[in-house]
Structure formats: structure tokens, C-alpha cells
């Protein structure tokens, strides 16, 4: 499994998990976050390996569709880069540092 794809799916899952069904959440979390194999997931849920594979592929497409429409992950990346640039340019500005800290905590809350 490609590390870039795994990282992206985990990130998209963090942003959009609440929009998925319980089954979709379980399969994606086990497959990407917990590194279960298709066979292990199939055994745990009493379904075929093919059923798990199909569900994961559909859920990947759903997560990508949410990102295409909502841009939550890509906007988060852009904000993080801007915050890093500001902190690098104004390292001793405590006002900016405090405001960025507040904005970052908003981005990272559950």
C-alpha cells in the first residue's frame, strides 16, 4: 500500500468520518489506520474479502468526493503553511504567535 495514499486517506477520514456510515468508518479505520488486511476485516465482520474491498474502494471515492466539494483538508494544509510562513517571518511577534495558536487549536479540535 502506498504511504502517500494511506496518509491521504487517514487525513480525509479525520475530516469526513462523521459523514460516513458505521460500516464505512469501521472498514476504512481498520484498513488504513490499524493496517488490517482485507482478509482480517472480512473475518471480523463475517463477510467476503471482495465485499470489504468493494466497500473500501467506494468509501475512498466518497471521501475524495467530499474533499472535492468541501476542501476541508486542502484548506487545512494551506492554513498550516501560511501559519508556518508567518511564524518564520515574525518569530518574536507574540501577538501573532498567540493568534496563530488560537487558530491552530480551532483547526485541531474534535
UniProtKB/Swiss-Prot annotation:
InterPro entries: RNA_pol_sigma_r3/r4-like, UPF0122, UPF0122_fam_protein, WH-like_DNA-bd_sf. Belongs to the UPF0122 family. PANTHER family: UPF0122 PROTEIN CBO2450/CLC_2298 (PTHR40083), UPF0122 PROTEIN YLXM (PTHR40083:SF1). Might take part in the signal recognition particle (SRP) pathway. This is inferred from the conservation of its genetic proximity to ftsY/ffh. May be a regulatory protein. This is UPF0122 protein SEQ_1180. It comes from Streptococcus equi subsp. equi (strain 4047).
